[in-house]
């Protein structure tokens, strides 16, 4: 949610942000109109109620010949107060509905355009020349099946399309990768949290995911009415809902470990083979509560954390600055790290980190205590540190001619010193 005072004073900035996102500019006028109607209705209600109270005070001491008249006026005003209250409540509801539709204000530095209009910030690492090495690279599913580590057939049998089993050493590789991510986060002062994967509608709505991603989210209907999270960002944002935080000693930094669920509603025909685009996966997510003035510095820190982790798994990658039209409703700025996938001949997203400024905090009523005793909304930020999809890039970039997979050096200590995952015969 945005600050209504900012919208009133900087209407052009908010409209420009909506335009850059490809969203309704007219919505800003709707917000301002409903704000005016809300304030006028509230003023009328408060004036009528004050008048009612004033007359009520006079009734007790009024002479007998005036008392009946005053009582009649009180009853008439009571009816008006009730009507004004109803109008004020209705106006407030319309205002809130309009406000909650507005997306966060895009940072001026974010590129213009849509999904394909990102800007490449930099590329890191050398892409392997498999032709020079004398063999054609196998895709991650072929490799994973060959080492008895990915079982799509039985995953589909159990859960339906886009489900899978991770087995044996590939399952161990995922645990190793996620554990290594947690260790790195803790070294940087993050607190580990294993988070709920079911959340209340108010929390999901508060994070902004029901604005543009509602069709991607699994929902449990009555009598439960809960949502399955697609990232632990949701639970970590909701953890301090309706709280006043002490950020005097610096930001609150969490890393959440959770299973995640996504419907992939708009992904028909995309990445139907393997584990790139699936309904369930595991992820370690960073989440930060920071002072407003520290959010940009914290965003850079999260991106640096992601790069540190990518260096450990030794895959070529690039960083892109996501265009305004491809941002989620909560994000003011977002950077993605995309790893090179040899068999696809292109980069695929492994991480994203977003600065949500005060947008989520306003919606969830999360504030910080100021030195003067007052409060103000905090900034929230998030970033991926490791997830199941990383296995795709690791396996394909570390494959050997015989179908084995070399384990990245930094991960070996997490896999009992094992250096290579060898092909295995099994009934796939």
From Swiss-Prot:
Disulfide bridge partners, by residue number: none
Pathway(s) of this molecule: Aminoacyl-tRNA biosynthesis; selenocysteinyl-tRNA(Sec) biosynthesis; L-seryl-tRNA(Sec) from L-serine and tRNA(Sec): step 1/1
Catalysed reaction equations from the record: tRNA(Ser) + L-serine + ATP = L-seryl-tRNA(Ser) + AMP + diphosphate + H(+); tRNA(Sec) + L-serine + ATP = L-seryl-tRNA(Sec) + AMP + diphosphate + H(+)
Binding site for L-serine: 231-233, 285, 384
Gene Ontology molecular function: any one: serine-tRNA ligase activity
Complexes and interactors: Homodimer. The tRNA molecule binds across the dimer.
Main subcellular location of this protein, as a coarse class: cytoplasm
Binding residues annotated for ATP, in chain numbering: 262-264, 278, 349-352
Chain segments annotated as transmembrane: none
Key words, A-Z: Aminoacyl-tRNA synthetase, ATP-binding, Cytoplasm, Ligase, Nucleotide-binding, Protein biosynthesis
Protein name: Serine--tRNA ligase
Location within or outside the cell: Cytoplasm
Assigned protein family: Belongs to the class-II aminoacyl-tRNA synthetase family. Type-1 seryl-tRNA synthetase subfamily.
Ligase in keyword set: yes
Role this protein plays: Catalyzes the attachment of serine to tRNA(Ser). Is also able to aminoacylate tRNA(Sec) with serine, to form the misacylated tRNA L-seryl-tRNA(Sec), which will be further converted into selenocysteinyl-tRNA(Sec).
GO biological process, one term: seryl-tRNA aminoacylation
Note on domains (UniProt): Consists of two distinct domains, a catalytic core and a N-terminal extension that is involved in tRNA binding.
EC numbers on record: 6.1.1.11
Gene: serS
Any one Gene Ontology cellular component term annotated for this protein: cytoplasm
């Amino acid at each position: 949610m945005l600050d209504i005072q900012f919208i009133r004073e900087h209407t052009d900035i908010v409209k420009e942000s909506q335009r850059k996102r490809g969203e309704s500019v007219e919505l800003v006028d709707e917000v301002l109109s409903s704000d005016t109607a809300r304030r006028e209705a509230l003023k009328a209600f408060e004036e009528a109620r004050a008048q009612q109270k004033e007359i009520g005070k006079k009734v007790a001491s009024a002479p007998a010949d005036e008392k009946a008249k005053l009582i009649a006026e009180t009853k008439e005003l009571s009816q008006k107060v009730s009507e004004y209250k109803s109008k004020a409540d209705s106006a407030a509801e319309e205002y809130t509905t309009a406000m909650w539709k507005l997306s966060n204000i895009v940072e001026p530095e974010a590129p213009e355009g849509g999904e394909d209009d990102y800007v490449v910030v930099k590329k890191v690492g050398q892409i392997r020349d498999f032709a020079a090495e004398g063999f054609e690279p196998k895709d991650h599913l072929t490799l994973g099946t060959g080492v008895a580590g990915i079982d799509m057939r039985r995953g589909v049998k159990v859960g339906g399309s886009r489900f899978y089993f991770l087995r044996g050493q590939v399952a161990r590789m995922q645990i190793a990768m996620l554990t290594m991510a947690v260790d790195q986060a803790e070294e940087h002062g993050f607190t580990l949290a294993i988070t709920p994967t079911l959340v209340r509608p108010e929390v999901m709505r508060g994070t902004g995911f029901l604005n543009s991603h509602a069709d991607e989210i699994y929902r449990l209907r009555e009598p439960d009415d809960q949502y399955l999270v697609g990232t632990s960002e949701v639970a970590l944002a909701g953890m301090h809902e309706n709280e006043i935080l002490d950020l005097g000693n610096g930001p609150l930094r969490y890393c959440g470990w959770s299973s995640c669920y996504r419907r992939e509603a708009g992904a028909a025909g995309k990445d139907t083979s393997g584990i790139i685009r699936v309904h369930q996966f595991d992820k370690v997510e960073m989440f930060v509560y920071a002072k407003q003035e520290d959010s940009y510095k914290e965003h850079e820190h999260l991106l640096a954390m992601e790069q540190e982790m990518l260096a450990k798994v030794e895959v070529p990658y690039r960083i892109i600055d996501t265009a305004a039209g491809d941002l989620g409703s909560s994000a003011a700025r977002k950077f993605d790290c995309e790893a090179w996938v040899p068999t696809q001949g292109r980069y695929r997203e492994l991480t994203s980190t977003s600065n949500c400024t005060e947008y989520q905090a306003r919606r969830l009523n999360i504030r910080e205590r100021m030195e003067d005793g007052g409060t103000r909304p905090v900034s929230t930020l998030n970033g991926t540190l490791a997830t199941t999809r990383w296995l795709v890039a690791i396996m394909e970039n570390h494959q050997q001619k015989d179908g084995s997979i070399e384990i990245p050096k930094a991960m070996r200590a997490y896999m009992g010193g094992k250096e290579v995952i060898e092909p295995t015969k099994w009934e796939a």
